[in-house]
């Protein structure tokens, strides 16, 4: 009789866990998943809970949940009260002292959602790094995704850290984001900021490049079959090109006089434009956190003040910003009890 003795594995628990995390399954987990999935679950769950049940009466003096009659466009998880400063508002912290209802009333769901959301986005970027390493491709997807992460962190975390409290961050909601955009314009003249201009150029330029690239590829597809649709005219694993780069180059050379000479430079440019635009916008928001000014054309302001017949679109915008500040502040910050006398409210030939 033969006795088979099993070989005892000399692998440690770390190697076993590493194999399990990187196992080929329908939804890849990986080490990054240990950060991504719990944080994403908490952030999404916190947002759904807050927009369904939580009021903003104690922080902003408004209604912000489905339970109070709001719809999808007007619900929000509002920022904490201005008096909370930059407290993390932990459920067990000195502010809420373990009372869940009090924690929600003070705005604890906002810090909960913001921090878990930030770590979830970082986990998603690390997930792309991890899968790229396992598959054996370059990590440019993760590098590209760093741009929206930078923008999220700068707007939702760094900007309010530069201000007096979390109160001045955007609340998590559609209409709430619109309010924040108006606030940015009125108090920082954001649209005239060069970093915002670079961000707009990057986003719109990226959209234009995508549209041009997609149309050009569709225009120059090889007719590999007699099917009615071009989607059946190729095999996903074929070694041959599915469109003609030479024809595309000739087409755009005739239109602009110049064209991309190879696919590598073309696709790098499509990556570079929107990513750098978002990065520049994020840097600009960090500047606003420090209350840095955008372009100020003081000479035009002085001349407009002295000459009622002189105005430019810049001086018009300055007056509009003053109106936003004067009329928005009492509504946006009711706890300050702002009362502006009539003589300081903006008036002039631009309004």
From Swiss-Prot:
Q: Catalysed reaction per UniProt?
A: 2 a plastoquinone + 4 hnu + 2 H2O = 2 a plastoquinol + O2
The record's listing under SUPFAM superfamilies reads: Bacterial photosystem II reaction centre, L and M subunits (SSF81483)
Locate the residues binding chlorophyll a PD2: 196
Record Pfam families: Photo_RC (PF00124)
**Binding positions for Fe cation?**
213, 267
Q: Which domain of life is it from?
A: Bacteria
Give the record's family classification.
Belongs to the reaction center PufL/M/PsbA/D family.
Name of the molecule in the record = Photosystem II D2 protein
Per the UniProt record, the source organism is Prochlorothrix hollandica
């Amino acid at each position: 009789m033969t006795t088979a003795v099993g070989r005892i594995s000399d692998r440690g628990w770390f190697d076993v866990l590493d194999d399990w995390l990187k196992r080929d399954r329908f939804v890849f987990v990986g080490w990054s998943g240990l950060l991504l999935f719990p944080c994403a679950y908490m952030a999404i769950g916190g947002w759904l809970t807050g927009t369904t049940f939580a009021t903003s009466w104690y922080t902003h003096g408004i209604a912000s949940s489905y339970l109070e009659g709001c719809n999808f466009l007007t619900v929000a998880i509002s920022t904490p009260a201005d008096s909370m400063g930059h407290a993390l508002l932990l459920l067990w912290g000195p502010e809420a002292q373990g009372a869940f209802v009090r924690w929600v009333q003070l705005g604890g769901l906002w810090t909960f959602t913001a921090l878990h959301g930030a770590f979830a986005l970082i986990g998603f970027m690390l997930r792309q790094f991890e899968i790229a390493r396992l598959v054996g491709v370059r990590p440019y997807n993760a590098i590209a995704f760093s741009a929206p992460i930078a923008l999220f962190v700068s707007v939702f975390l760094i900007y309010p850290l530069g201000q007096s409290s979390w109160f001045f961050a955007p609340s998590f909601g559609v209409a709430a984001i619109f309010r924040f955009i108006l606030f940015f314009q009125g108090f920082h003249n954001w649209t005239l900021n060069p970093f915002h201009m670079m961000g707009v150029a990057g986003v719109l330029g990226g959209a234009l490049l995508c549209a041009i690239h997609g149309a050009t590829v569709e225009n120059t597809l090889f007719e590999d079959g007699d099917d009615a649709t071009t989607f059946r005219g190729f095999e996903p694993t074929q070694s041959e090109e599915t469109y003609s780069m030479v024809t595309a180059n000739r087409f755009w050379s005739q239109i602009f006089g110049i064209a991309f000479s190879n696919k590598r430079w073309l696709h790098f440019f499509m990556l570079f434009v929107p990513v750098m635009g978002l990065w520049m916008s994020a840097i600009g928001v960090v500047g606003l956190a420090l209350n840095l000014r955008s372009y100020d054309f003081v000479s035009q302001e002085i001349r407009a003040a002295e000459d009622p017949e002189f105005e430019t679109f810049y001086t018009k915008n300055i007056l509009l910003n003053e109106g936003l500040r004067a009329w928005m502040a009492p509504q946006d910050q009711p706890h300050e009890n702002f009362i502006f006398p009539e003589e300081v409210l903006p008036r002039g030939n631009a309004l």
